[in-house]
Amino acid sequence: MSEAATATLAVPVNERDHVMGPANAPVIVVNYGDYQCPGCQQRHRSTEKMARELLDSVRLVHRHFPLVKSHPHALRAAEAAEAAASQGKFWEMHRLLFLRPDKLRDRDLRGYAKEIRLDLETFDREMASGIYADRILKDFYFSLNHGITGTPTTFINGVRYAQSGVELVATVKAIVEEQVAKRLQ
């Protein structure tokens, strides 16, 4: 198992987070990501595969960390994900945004909203109002002040890991096996 960095997760998983997986999962993976970040796209593919393989043992959490200076569409994409979340479809939008990182202009985001069958009137109103931008940016600056400096950044059970997607999946599998063994003792 690769050595973990000493950094720990500043904010525990809470009701504001986007979560997939059982509440009692022995392993919690928190990803900080940006929809235009190539590394995040690779990490998304790895964690999506991991979620399918370890469905009952892992809880996935996504937190926005849009690097707006280098990724001009990342904030709007995060807003679209939040607008989808308000209609119960965060993960559907999240997946599309990572699958199509070169198509994140407003017209593209609206097309994705239509594709996942969001109420377009509500989506359009929320996107026009910018109601999610302030929260996303506040979370970004809070995270920045607590040691998150780039993407992708991943924490497993509260400890920061700096690994490639493949290595990360192997680490999570090892931690799941370790946690399951502890429960059986």
Predicted regions mapped to residue ranges:
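Residue-level signal for pocket-adjacent positions within structured domains
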Residues: 8, 13-15, 122, 156
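A short beta-strand-turn-helix
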Residues: 10-27, 52
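N-terminal targeting signals for export/organelle localization
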Residues: 1-10, 185
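C-terminal cap of thioredoxin/glutaredoxin-like
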Residues: 45-49, 111-185
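Short clusters of hydrophobic/aromatic residues that line enzyme substrate/ligand-binding pockets
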Residues: 19-20, 104, 161
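Residues immediately within or flanking Cys/His clusters that coordinate Zn2+
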Residues: 26, 34, 151
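Structural alpha/beta surface segment adjacent to cysteine/selenocysteine redox centers
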Residues: 30-114, 119, 175, 179-185
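Short secondary-structure boundary/capping elements
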Residues: 11-12, 42, 135
